[in-house]
């Protein structure tokens, strides 16, 4: 390369060429040349070499000394020597070039911008000779200030090397019929794609790119830069780039963002870690296991999340959830407490963090009780279950007298036994000597798919707290039909009998705590464990959980003790069993007797008395005036009997002896029984069953919920009314059970409930109202995400350890997505009217958006007095919508709803033809085009049509690379097809047909195969494009990112598409080669056939001649 035809130059001793590649780049580094010029860098070197090889180089041609530059440009001295050698040649203009190299006038002249006169005049030689020295590079190859040494006379571009300038003029400004000229300037291009890319220089920003790929698809155009968007909200966010507006600020690091997607990514990522956890949940790295937690004080105006954060920060993580959950959520998801009501002070000392099993925690709170919503953190929708029951206890305890009882009862099926034992030890936590919750059973799903959560809450002293389970309708709450009044412990005898009936009824259904109960899982377990004193009633150990035995044994110590509390609990259980099945079989009675630890004869007699109506009188005993007993009107589906809290009711609500549930009434949260908010001082177990009931009797007497619980607090109600209410509640709870009969007063278990005006309960959420003596109601809302939700049975035993037995008779234990305990606490009954706002803890209301049709929040449904229903989805304090299953936060509720599909797998839009489902409607619309054959998008160059905008956009993003490849492939295919077809002409006529038919068949077959391959590949491309578009649309709709991220994604997609296209092209080429080989083989076979035919013909002729001779 260094030696031209002259061969007079000396080669450098050790030429350094390691910077040759960089030199070309450096030469034009400071020039304005665009990509088109850079495309020809390699051509420049080849042109230079060609120029050197010419014998006579015109003066205007590049001198040979230029060719040395690529080799020795890194060293100024070597360049100088080369120039000096060339000066000695005859073809050089003069011997004074070396002097001119150093002539400052020449250098000054060369620096001038208006050098149009230089080209193509001869003086350019001198100027060029001065160039290398003037523009010498230092050792590292950096260019000096002479970047504009040679300027193009047409476009004023500057070049250091004359070669580059000539090449630029040749390829950009010389016009001919084969070139493509720019209509706005004098540029010419060899390829249309170069011209199209060049046109972007005449437009602002990335307008051209968006125009090409939009194809009319992007309606919203930015007036500043011309960029277009498919969605208006994307344009709005884009305009913030021009305006500089950054409305989103990180509460932790104070960084601001213009795009909600960037803000959401920042918040959900682990990059920004501080004391303020996302979504009210502390980061795992921030959690500590301190023995005490800062006290939380909620004032009416104080924000709730900071308070929650304070409370949560010291909570250690719960035991890890079992591995088989549908979704593995962050560990800290388990704790999402929410402070529900303002104006309530609560100090919550936590022992070693959150719920140390069996540990007793006492906290002092204002007499109103702590208004704190604790979410039952069960993550996932399938077994095993991990439930934190300590929160439930905390809620109930706080509601009672401000003391917080925390009990760890995580019911994982895998470790049920150990956990239940912990629950047993923790269950006998006493608050002021009174146990609040003795145990909670595993959530179970009934055979019909209904789920119940039962929490039995019993206080020794009636004056402390009245717990009225309030029924939350899972779906639409029905008019309040069943009311339950909790009675003072004075009605223990009646209660004990009723407990027996309750137990019997529960036994008939499957008991969550013990498997003995064959009947409904929901009702039986609730009832059995309902026995506060007898909670230990060691029912036969459930196969799923064996730890209940130990707990049962501990709690069973008071089985038949004559003390009133155990009797009362037994009566409640028996009544529950009776409500389930008024006429149990012998086997059922045996199971009931085993569950309540009573002789079979006693249980049988009690049932007989109940059927004869002999026991109702006892149940009708008026409750002690001290304890308030709220009457909840109980209505059976067939025979609804509204009961006014103030009006006594007859004994037989069902037509059978009334059941008195007062002492340990089990109220299904999801079932029709809604405990009136009236508080019963007597220990009353809290039964939360979230089973769906056809009639949601979530409301207590109509007046009770709507009014500030004045009526519910009315304690003068006769016991008879209480019994009726209790019995109705029990029946409603168990009506779902297999053994439940239509005769039962309330069948609330499985049927979807109609919305009740009285009970403002959100769909699919059972609510339990725990009302402290101050008439502050505590609403426990158990949202149910799926139709089948597990039931939790919590048994409160007075001063005794309850027996927890989780009986998974169906073995269908499912995790409850969340259980939110919202407490609307009011200082006094009169103040209850504005129940404290219920803050959705885990986005339960968001979850309900998918399942419920009502946009009413839990608190709205819980409080009939409350203001008009609010949106289901609640905003966090920063105005964002937080996902309750992960750390993501969204700006819009619709984005959150779409995001929830990722957790639930829900695809609401289904194709009516192939039944394929999609998350977004527009995806279904594009999918339908596959069936209809519609292809509204067409490439303006190759005419190819697309049914999906994503496929079209990808095609356009590749700058017609598909079109070019398609044309090349078609040409190649045509050549291959025509090649073998010429052979038949040479063959004899009789063989032409034989030869042509197979070859034609081969070609036809190959063409058909090629078409099929093309169609298959096209379908695959469309499917891939559609999937990619879905991802893009999801990102655009949910989480729009910065422009840079979008570009990177597009580039990656382009690369992937190019790779796929290359693979397809190779595949087609291989197929074509294979086809050619097949044709060659056919031709050979035809030739051999011809040879054989000619041979046979000659042989026949010879034979004829022989015969003639």
Swiss-Prot record:
InterPro entries: Di19_Zn-bd (IPR008598), HD (IPR001356), Homeodomain-like_sf (IPR009057), Znf_C2H2_sf (IPR036236), Znf_C2H2_type (IPR013087), ZnF_E-box_Homeobox (IPR051574). Belongs to the delta-EF1/ZFH-1 C2H2-type zinc-finger family. One of its GO terms (cellular component) is nucleus. One of its GO terms (molecular function) is RNA polymerase II cis-regulatory region sequence-specific DNA binding. It comes from Rattus norvegicus (Rat). Acts as a transcriptional repressor. Binds to E-box sequences in the immunoglobulin heavy chain enhancer as well as in the regulatory regions of many other tissue-specific genes. Represses E-cadherin promoter and induces an epithelial-mesenchymal transition (EMT) by recruiting SMARCA4/BRG1. Represses BCL6 transcription in the presence of the corepressor CTBP1. Positively regulates neuronal differentiation. Represses RCOR1 transcription activation during neurogenesis. Represses transcription by binding to the E box (5'-CANNTG-3'). Residues 87-98, 1012-1066 have a biased composition (Acidic residues). A zinc finger (C2H2-type) spans 150-173, 180-202, 220-242, 248-272, 881-903, 909-931, 937-958. There is a cross-link at residues 327, 752 (Glycyl lysine isopeptide (Lys-Gly) (interchain with G-Cter in SUMO)). Residues 654-665, 673-703 have a biased composition (Polar residues). The gene is Zeb1. Ubiquitinated, leading to degradation in a proteasome-dependent manner. Deubiquitinated by USP51, leading to stabilization. There is a cross-link at residues 166, 175, 287, 311, 315, 327, 419, 473, 484, 495, 528, 752 (Glycyl lysine isopeptide (Lys-Gly) (interchain with G-Cter in SUMO2)). SMART domains: HOX (SM00389), ZnF_C2H2 (SM00355). The modification Phosphoserine is found at residues 31, 33, 293, 302, 657, 664, 671, 678, 682. This is Zinc finger E-box-binding homeobox 1. Residues 15-30, 288-304, 1071-1087 have a biased composition (Low complexity). Residues 1-106, 123-143, 278-307, 468-501, 525-566, 614-711, 834-873, 968-1109 are annotated as: Disordered. Residues 559-618 bind DNA. The keyword Calcium does not apply. Residues 483-501, 1097-1109 have a biased composition (Basic and acidic residues). The modification Phosphothreonine is found at residue 680. Coiled coil: none annotated. GO terms for biological process: animal organ development; cartilage development; cell population proliferation; cellular response to amino acid stimulus; cellular response to transforming growth factor beta stimulus; central nervous system development; cochlea morphogenesis; embryonic camera-type eye morphogenesis.
């Amino acid at each position: 390369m260094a030696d031209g035809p002259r061969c007079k130059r000396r080669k450098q001793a050790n030429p350094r060429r390691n910077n040759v590649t960089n030199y070309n780049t450096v030469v034009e580094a400071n020039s304005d040349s665009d990509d088109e010029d850079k495309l020809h860098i390699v051509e420049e070197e080849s042109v230079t070499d060609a120029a050197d090889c010419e014998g006579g180089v015109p003066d205007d041609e590049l001198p040979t000394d230029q060719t040395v530059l690529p080799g020795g440009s890194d060293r100024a001295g070597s360049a100088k020597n080369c120039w000096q050698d060339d000066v000695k040649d005859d073809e050089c203009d003069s011997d004074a070039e070396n002097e001119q190299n150093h002539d400052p006038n020449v250098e000054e002249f060369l620096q001038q911008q208006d050098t149009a006169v230089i080209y193509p005049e001869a003086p350019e030689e001198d100027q060029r000779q001065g160039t290398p020295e003037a523009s010498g590079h230092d050792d590292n190859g950096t260019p000096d200030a002479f970047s504009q040494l040679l300027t193009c006379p047409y476009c004023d571009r500057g070049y250091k090397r004359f070669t580059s300038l000539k090449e630029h003029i040749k390829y950009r400004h010389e016009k001919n019929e084969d070139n493509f000229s720019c209509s706005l300037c004098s540029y010419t291009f060899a390829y249309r794609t170069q011209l199209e890319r060049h046109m972007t220089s005449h437009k602002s920003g990335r307008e051209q790119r968006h125009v090409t790929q939009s194809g009319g698809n992007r309606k919203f155009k930015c007036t500043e830069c011309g960029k277009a968007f498919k969605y208006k909200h994307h344009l709005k966010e884009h305009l913030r780039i021009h305006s500089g507006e950054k409305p989103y600020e990180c509460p932790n690091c104070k960084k601001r963002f213009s795009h909600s997607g960037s803000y959401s990514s920042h918040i959900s990522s682990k990059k920004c870690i501080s004391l303020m956890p996302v979504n009210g949940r502390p980061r795992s790295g921030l959690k500590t296991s301190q023995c005490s937690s800062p006290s939380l004080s909620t004032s009416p105006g104080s924000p709730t999340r900071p308070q929650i954060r304070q409370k949560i920060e010291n909570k250690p993580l719960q035991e890890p959830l079992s591995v088989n959950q549908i979704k593995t959520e962050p560990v800290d998801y388990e704790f999402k407490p929410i402070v529900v009501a303002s104006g309530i002070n609560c100090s919550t000392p936590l022992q070693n963090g959150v719920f140390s099993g069996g540990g007793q925690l006492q906290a002092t709170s204002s007499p109103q009780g702590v208004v704190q919503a604790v979410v039952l953190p069960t993550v996932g929708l399938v077994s095993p279950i991990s439930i934190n029951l300590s929160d439930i206890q905390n809620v109930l305890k706080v509601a009672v007298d401000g003391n917080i009882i925390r009990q760890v009862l995580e019911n994982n099926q895998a470790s049920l036994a150990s956990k239940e034992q912990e629950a047993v030890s923790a269950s006998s936590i006493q608050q002021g000597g009174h146990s609040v919750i003795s145990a909670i059973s595993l959530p179970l799903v009934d055979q019909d798919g209904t789920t119940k959560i039962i929490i039995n809450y019993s206080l020794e002293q009636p004056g402390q707290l009245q717990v009225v389970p309030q029924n939350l309708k899972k779906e639409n709450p029905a008019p309040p039909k069943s009311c339950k009044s909790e009675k003072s412990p004075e009605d223990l005898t009646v209660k004990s009998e009723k407990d027996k009936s309750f137990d019997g009824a529960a036994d008939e259904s499957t008991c969550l705590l013990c498997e003995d109960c064959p009947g409904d899982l929901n009702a039986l377990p609730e009832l059995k464990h309902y026995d506060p004193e007898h909670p230990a009633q060691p029912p036969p150990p459930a196969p799923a959980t064996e730890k209940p035995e130990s707990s049962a044994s501990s709690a069973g110590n008071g089985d038949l003790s004559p003390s009133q509390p155990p009797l009362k609990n037994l009566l409640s259980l028996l009544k529950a069993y009776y409500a389930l099945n008024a006429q149990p079989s012998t086997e059922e009675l045996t199971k009931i007797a085993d569950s309540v630890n009573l002789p079979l004869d006693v249980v049988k007699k009690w049932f007989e008395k109940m059927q004869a109506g002999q026991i109702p009188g006892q149940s009708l005993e008026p409750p002690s005036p001290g304890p308030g007993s709220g009457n909840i009107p109980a209505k059976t589906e067939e025979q609804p009997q509204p009961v006014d809290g103030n009006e006594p009711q007859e004994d037989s609500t069902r037509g059978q002896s009334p059941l008195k549930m007062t002492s340990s009434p089990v109220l299904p949260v999801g079932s029709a029984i809604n405990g009136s908010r009236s508080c019963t001082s007597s220990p009353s177990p809290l039964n939360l069953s979230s089973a769906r009931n056809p009639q949601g009797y979530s409301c207590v007497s109509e007046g009770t919920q709507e009014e500030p619980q004045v009526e519910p607090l009315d304690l003068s109600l006769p016991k008879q009314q209480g019994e009726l209410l209790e019995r109705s509640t029990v029946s409603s709870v168990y009506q779902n059970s297999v053994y439940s009969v239509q005769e039962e007063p309330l069948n609330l278990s499985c049927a979807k409930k109609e919305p009740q005006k009285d009970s403002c309960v959100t769909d699919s959420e059972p609510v339990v109202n725990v009302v402290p003596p101050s008439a502050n109601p505590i609403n426990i809302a158990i949202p149910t995400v799926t139709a089948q939700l597990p039931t939790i049975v919590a048994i409160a035993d007075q001063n005794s350890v309850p027996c927890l037995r989780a009986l998974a008779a169906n073995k269908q234990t499912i995790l409850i997505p969340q259980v939110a305990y919202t407490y609307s606490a009011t200082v006094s009954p009169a103040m209850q009217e504005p129940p404290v706002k219920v803050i959705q803890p885990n986005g339960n209301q968001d979850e309900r958006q998918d399942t419920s049709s009502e946009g009413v929040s839990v608190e709205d449904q819980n409080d009939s007095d409350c203001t008009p229903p609010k949106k289901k989805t609640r905003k966090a304090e920063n105005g964002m919508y937080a996902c309750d299953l992960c750390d993501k936060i969204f700006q819009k509720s619709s984005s959150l709803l779409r995001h929830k599909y990722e957790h639930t797998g829900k695809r609401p839009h289904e194709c009516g033809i192939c039944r394929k489902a999609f998350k977004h409607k527009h995806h279904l619309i594009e999918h339908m085009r596959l069936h209809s054959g519609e292809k509204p998008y067409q490439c303006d160059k190759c005419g190819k049509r697309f049914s999906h905008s994503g496929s079209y956009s990808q095609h356009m993003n590749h700058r017609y690379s598909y079109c070019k490849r398609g044309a090349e492939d078609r040409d190649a295919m045509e050549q291959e097809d025509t090649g073998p077809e010429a052979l038949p002409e040479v063959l004899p006529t009789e063989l032409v047909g034989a030869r042509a038919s197979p070859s034609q068949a081969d070609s036809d077959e190959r063409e058909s195969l090629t078409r099929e391959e093309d169609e298959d590949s096209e379908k695959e491309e469309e499917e891939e494009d559609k999937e990619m578009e879905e991802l893009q649309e999801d990102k655009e709709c949910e989480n729009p990112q910065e422009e840079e991220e979008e570009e990177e994604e597009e580039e990656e997609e382009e690369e992937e598409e190019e790779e796929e296209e290359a693979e397809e092209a190779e595949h087609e080429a291989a197929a074509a080669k294979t086809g050619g080989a097949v044709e060659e083989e056919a031709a050979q076979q035809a030739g051999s056939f011809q040879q054989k035919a000619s041979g046979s013909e000659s042989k026949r002729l010879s034979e004829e001649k022989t015969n003639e001779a």
